[in-house]
C-alpha cells in the first residue's frame, strides 16, 4: 500500500547488493502493530509483518499466515512468532550467543534472550 516505500527499500537492497555489502548488512523494516486490510485505518495488534533482507539470512520468503474470513488479517493463523523469537533470530543473525547471561546488580542472572525463545529457523543459514 506504500509504493514509495517499496521503491526506496528495493533501491537500498539493490545498492547494498551491488556494492557487495548485503550479506554483511541486516535490514529490518517493521512497525509495532499490524494494519487492517484495504485502507489500513485500523490497528491489528495481534498480527503484524516484518521485512528482513541481507545479513546472510534466507530471505525472499513468507513465514506465517494471517486469518481469512470475517476479519482478514486480524490474527495469526499459521506459524506465530513471538517477540522473544524475533529477538533470538536477530541476535543469531548478528552472531550473538543467545544463551549468554549477564549479571545484574545483586548477582541476578539476566539472559540475553528469554529462555522460551524459538529462533525463526526458516530464516537462518
Q: Which stretches of residues belong to each language-model region?
A:
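Ligand-binding pockets and gating/stacking loops
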Residues: 1-125
Amino acid at each position: 500500500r506504500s509504493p514509495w516505500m517499496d521503491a526506496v527499500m528495493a533501491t537500498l537492497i539493490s545498492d547494498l547488493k551491488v556494492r557487495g555489502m548485503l550479506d554483511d548488512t541486516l535490514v529490518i523494516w517493521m512497525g509495532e502493530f499490524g494494519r487492517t486490510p484495504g485502507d489500513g485505518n485500523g490497528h491489528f495488534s495481534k498480527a503484524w509483518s516484518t521485512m528482513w533482507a541481507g545479513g546472510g539470512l534466507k530471505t525472499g520468503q513468507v513465514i506465517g499466515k494471517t486469518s481469512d474470513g470475517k476479519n482478514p488479517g486480524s490474527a495469526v493463523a499459521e506459524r506465530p512468532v513471538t517477540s522473544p523469537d524475533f529477538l533470538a533470530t536477530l541476535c543469531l543473525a548478528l552472531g550473538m550467543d543467545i544463551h549468554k547471561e549477564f549479571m545484574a546488580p545483586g548477582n541476578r542472572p539476566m539472559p540475553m534472550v528469554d529462555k522460551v525463545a524459538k529462533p525463526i529457523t526458516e530464516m537462518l543459514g
